[in-house]
Amino acid sequence: MEFEEIRPYHDEELPQVFEELIADPAFQQVACAVMPGVPFEAIAQKMRASKTKQEFQENLCYGILHKLAKDTTDGLILESMAVLNKQSAYTYVSNHRDIILDSGFLSVLLVEQGLDTVEIAIGDNLLIYPWIKKLVRINKCFTVQRALTMRQMLESSIRMSRYMHYTIAEKKQSIWIAQREGRAKDSNDVTQDSVLKMLAMGGDGDIITNLQELNIVPLSISYEYDPCDYLKAQEFQLKRDIPDYKKTTDDDLLNMQTGLLGYKGRVCFRMASCINEDLDELERTLPKPELFVA
């Protein structure tokens, strides 16, 4: 199947994956650290009782995210201009502040509005260990493939765009994706042209029609305090001073841990309306470069 390499798990695959995770000492250690005081046997029991990805999120993830919001923020709020149809699926495109919690907190806020959690675009550079790759696929993540040749990157972008169009149109499942590759180290949140071009690759119409099929909803995420600010500043400086600098696996793990557990102050998600009507106002005959800038 076209999407086998990048898709989340199907529900019928979960029992085997749960057993593999339960038997993994590294996963056991992380699970007990995230849920202190809860015996791992109780965690394993909740996993085995989950028959779907949705049930897994309800039984385990929702409570963890609520606790993280309580312990590490001074409040989590959603300000919305959008009137969302609960029968429709949307593509939430946001700035990127935290590797895990951007999409995690968004899902909590959507559930509180009576909406479904989102499928999440995640870079394969973050899938450092087998247990991480399994866990994110349980949590409705699909993979953005990195470190490819130019030709492979084009093929990967087309496949991912087709998957996103399929997910919105056929699965009726909303999606979250960041507006750029990686977090903005200088907080200059500019949407990358390459992301917009990728989104438009998957449909059968023109650029405007293809983008409209995704029901794009712009989203802004604000943390009063960024627990990873010093790590971002350090990386920004290293990239400036060392042209071939690359983050290590340990760097990624430290960023994930610090982002999860660090103090954030007030956290606000601001949601605009779906941009389909705005796209209708654009001149479809404009050259591609001008369309993406518009």
What are these regions (language model features)?
Residues 48-51, 62-65, 92-94, 114-116, ...:
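N-terminal start-of-chain detector that recognizes signal peptides
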Residues 27-40, 61, 84, 116-125, ...:
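Short N-terminal helix-initiation segments at or just after the protein's N-terminus
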Residues 49-55, 129, 147-150, 284-292:
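Intrinsic-disorder/low-complexity, polar/charged segments
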